[in-house]
Amino acid sequence: LGNALVNTGRSGEGARIYLQAANNAKAEQALELRRKAAEQFLLGGHIDEGLKVLETVMGSMGIKVPPTPKRALLSLLLRRLQIRLRGLIFKSQTEAEIPANQLLKIDACWSAALGLAIVDTIRGAEFQGRHMLLALAAGEPYRVARAITLEAGFSSTTGSRGKKRTEMLLKMAKELVDKINVPHAQGLFYLMAGIASFLAGEWLKAHENLEQSTSIFSQNCTGVNWEIDNAQLFSLRSLLYLGELNKLCERLPAIVKQAHERWDIYAITGLGTALSYMPCIIEDNPEQARKNMWEAIEKWSHEGFHLQHYWALLGQVQVEVYSGQGNTALKIINAQWSPMVKGLLLEVQNSLVEMLQLRARAALATLKTTENQMLKDY
């Protein structure tokens, strides 16, 4: 039943069924069921529940979940150093040749890395470092391929600093993915290649890769709603930056409707914060834009400062600048700047550049408002 719910996109419900089943299962199977529950909670946007279960799963394996992004950063730097010193060479082994507890540990770190990747990027990257080292040590080709592919996605968040490494990882990932010929690995490759292009400002290339990813996942895989959610989200955001607003407005309502039908909090929040304001601005309805974003972020975790909070901030400021409320826009940014820095969101180069230009626009809008008021007073 849990698998059936996950396959229909009901991640939260599926996760709860996994937890119920774990209570009546033997130790090893119970741990695997709890891992799957943690993964589905995180992928479905039930972040607080997911982290709670994840702590239990990781604790049973002797792995501590970093309590904050800052704590995770120190561990991440160590993992990255270990990966560089070790290299990416691996000895291929079949799944049957690898101990079950070793595979479970790899999969648990994969669940954490994937589930936090586009929520709490630094904490996700820390688990990805662990995941990468474990996958390479085991040598199972599919797990190595997805580890290197996901590593390319995380590497792309460093922007121009990590461009060469990202390109190298994507090249290696493509060779592995083509060799093993597993649809999920193929879809994941185009998803990460698309996100890497998006973060590099190559939006047409990003859109093409992300559309390819959506097609592969939709036609060949089950239980991949998170993957499709992100392929669609970043594809639509690419259209936004390309200025293809008509295409964006045509496609967005149906995707939002589908997310609500399966109560996919991850998709509802991402679409609601990162994109829903734009059609409202086009229709000159800033009040509806504010309402849409508030309803979207209201459903999200209130612990920490996640990428979803960043998207909400981005949208709110865009709406206030459009409305001529530069002073309000600047106040919103300034109020959220400290939590954003604390959450290490600005360690992602694309986010830093975007937020700096937005703060400058808000400051200019404030200046314009002040000048207009001075002219009126005069």
Description of each model-found segment:
Residues L42-E126, T157-M168, N225-D229, L240-E250, ...:
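Amphipathic helix-loop-helix modules that constitute alpha-helical solenoid scaffolds
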Residues G9, A25-K26, N101, V119-D120, ...:
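Short coil/turn linker motifs that delimit alpha-helical repeat modules in TPR/alpha-solenoid proteins
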Residues T158-E261:
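Hydrophobic, small-residue-rich alpha-helical packing segments that form membrane-like cores
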Residues L116-K163, N181-Y190, S197-W203:
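A conserved hydrophobic secondary-structure block that centers on an alpha-helix together
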Residues L19-N23, T56-P66, T94, M132-L136, ...:
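Amphipathic alpha-helical segments of tetratricopeptide repeats
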Residues L1-G44, E49-T56, I98-E140, A147:
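Extended alpha-helical scaffolding segments used for macromolecular assembly and cargo binding
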